[in-house]
Amino acid sequence: MISKINFVKMHGLGNDFVVVNKRDLSSSYDLSQLAKNMADRHTGIGCDQFIIYEEHDDFYEMIIYNIDGSSAKLCGNATRCLAKLIYLDTGKKDITVMVGNKKLLCNVEDENNISVNVGKVSFNEVWMPSRDKIWELAERYMIDLKETICVDIGNPHLVIFSKLEPQDQKIVGEKLQAKELFADGVNVNFAEVKDNKIYLSVWERGAGLTLACGSGACGSFAAGLKLGFIHSPSTVVFKYGSLTMKEENGNIIMQGAATLVARGEYYCEQ
């Protein structure tokens, strides 16, 4: 039997998503498999992550799947996209999004300026692998471990303040997913600082290198503040645009654009 699913295609600075309202999904769907199918760029719609949302009385719940069908704990760009979608559909400007137990406060200033308060981050050494385990990688790719830091922003990020070529970013990103290094994988941020701006590339666990990463921007901004490389406010620059970052009372706030690409129907065999 073939069923129809309404979807929205959106992107934040090139980081793209297929977004579906939970009310349009049958309870019989295997959501992990559906995510893999719809995310496929050859046989599906194509995206970096698959987003399901549900409206509640005073917040919207967001569930995130990676292209490999695994779940993700946070996505800053997807949050901005969802906030814009809700604004376009309802006119609401102040929107609360829940991802798991993480509350994200969003404000739509206009269609091209959406801010998300992601709250406080922690610099969590608990899941940092022992230095000797990554010494070989650091030595081979000239990574300064004194300028490498773990940030937990609701999902785990390893921020490396060293310039690596794209082909080396791919290799290092893949190698750091090894279970003996990070049991659940890790998002790897390659950050370069110039004139109080962070130029960022991110290897996302479950997705690989993406054109932009909102949570990576937040984590890298927080890491840059802690290490004294930048001050607030700052800008995080990606290939297709930038995010404005600031810190207020310990909370990290990002602001940037989100783009609606298309609305359509996906036909699913059950």
Swiss-Prot record:
Keyword annotations of the record: Amino-acid biosynthesis, Cytoplasm, Isomerase, Lysine biosynthesis
GO terms for cellular component: cytosol
Site feature: Could be important to modulate the pK values of the two catalytic cysteine residues: 157, 204
Protein name: Diaminopimelate epimerase
One Pfam family hit: DAP_epimerase
Catalytic residues as annotated in Swiss-Prot or TrEMBL: 75, 213
Source lineage: Bacteria, Pseudomonadati, Pseudomonadota, Alphaproteobacteria, Rickettsiales
Record: residues binding substrate: 15, 49, 66, 76-77, 155, 187, 204-205, 214-215
Role according to the record: Catalyzes the stereoinversion of LL-2,6-diaminopimelate (L,L-DAP) to meso-diaminopimelate (meso-DAP), a precursor of L-lysine and an essential component of the bacterial peptidoglycan.
Any GO BP: lysine biosynthetic process via diaminopimelate
Gene that produces this protein: dapF
Subunit structure: Homodimer.
Pathway in which the depicted protein is active: Amino-acid biosynthesis; L-lysine biosynthesis via DAP pathway; DL-2,6-diaminopimelate from LL-2,6-diaminopimelate: step 1/1
Record-listed E.C. numbers: 5.1.1.7
Subcellular localization: Cytoplasm
